Amino acid sequence: MSDLRDPAPYDALLLLSFGGPEGPDDVVPFLANVTRGRGIPEERLKEVGQHYFLFGGVSPINEQNRALLGALRKDFADHGLDLPVYWGNRNWAPYLTDVLREMTTDGHRRIAVLATSAYASYSGCRQYRENLAESLAALEAEGLEVPRVDKLRHYFNHPGFVAPMVDGVLASLADLPEDVRAGAHLAFTTHSIPTSAADASGPVEAHGEGGAYVAEHLDVARLIVDAVRAETGIEYPWRLVYQSRSGAPHIPWLEPDICDHLETLGAEGVPAVVMAPIGFVSDHMEVLYDLDTEATAKAAEIGLPVRRSATVGDDPRFAAAVRDLLLERAATERGRAVERCALGSLGPSHDLCPVGCCPARAPKPAAAGADSPYV
């Protein structure tokens, strides 16, 4: 095997995701896991769970992750990469601690981790690292030999992540009626987070209004707009907007909300909109409910034609990007200088989260960072 195709020192890859219910009886326990420590009563969890009950109590994220797991295994096998791929979740089965225990008993000692979150933020990165540290501490308490885990860098601007989204936007534009297509507006959506969390996202030097979270999304949106212009010859107007807000109404979150944005566009006479969920790797419940159900209903109410572009999901180009990220990090860990693939103005993200990156309100141990107790 070529040195640059060698996964060493890694002996396994962990696909780490959020998790979701697989049936109606799972919904409230799942939401209790998501909100643990906040003292939210069960009746309120049942209210929040209505989004899931509309879809039979099943989150689409699990099937999406199974498909991505299969795509990764196929890509690795097709390219002669003999590396097992496991899947674990933060909030539902297969639980992270159980999967790390399985990996440890299977003999794996150096594990690369791919989180299904492409951008910098507390909830999209450090919280995953905190959960990894909690699970490693649990294994240590059981007397098991604790493996080293390394989280692969943020991939928001990797060509294998961006290209499928470009194709999705182009397909959605082509699906619009011809008489409104050229005048369409592109609404790039991502999960809203508190403005304080956005401002503190990424390394300390990126902190400020919007932080790395907003800057990274804007960079991806510009990449897509440029690629669409190159393909169509049209400079489509666009904006980064937000969705899926939760929490107390008095706490500022990133705005505008997608539904408010659609109302504004309708009032301005915009003839059509493509909603592009660039903040989501796959069709989460936030995509199926907040965009396909709620935002689409709002657009119909005001007579605005909309299309929702596809997420990356298990696109073979994304699976290849994961392989590239893995081999890049492996070579770096072996002391090799390698090309780090990235598009846009921000360049490739860091391998090791520095101290102060995406800080938590209450400091907790986090794995796979410069401040990690597990190295």
Curated annotation (Swiss-Prot):
SUPFAM superfamilies documented for this protein: Chelatase
Cross-referenced Gene3D superfamilies: 3.40.50.1400
Reaction equation(s) it catalyzes: Fe-coproporphyrin III + 2 H(+) = coproporphyrin III + Fe(2+)
Pathway, per record: Porphyrin-containing compound metabolism; protoheme biosynthesis
Upper taxonomic lineage: Bacteria, Bacillati, Actinomycetota, Actinomycetes, Kitasatosporales
Name of the protein this chain belongs to: Coproporphyrin III ferrochelatase
Classification via CDD domains: Ferrochelatase_C (cd00419), Ferrochelatase_N (cd03411)
Family label: Belongs to the ferrochelatase family.
Cell compartments where the protein resides: Cytoplasm
Superkingdom to which the source organism belongs: Bacteria
Keywords: Cytoplasm, Heme biosynthesis, Iron, Lyase, Metal-binding, Porphyrin biosynthesis
GO annotation, biological process: heme biosynthetic process
Residues annotated for Fe-coproporphyrin III binding in this entry: 59, 128
Function of the molecule: Involved in coproporphyrin-dependent heme b biosynthesis. Catalyzes the insertion of ferrous iron into coproporphyrin III to form Fe-coproporphyrin III.
Enzyme class at the top of the EC tree: lyase
Major location category of this protein: cytoplasm
Binding positions for Fe(2+) per the UniProt entry: 191, 286
Molecular function in Gene Ontology: ferrochelatase activity; metal ion binding
A GO cellular component entry from the record: cytoplasm
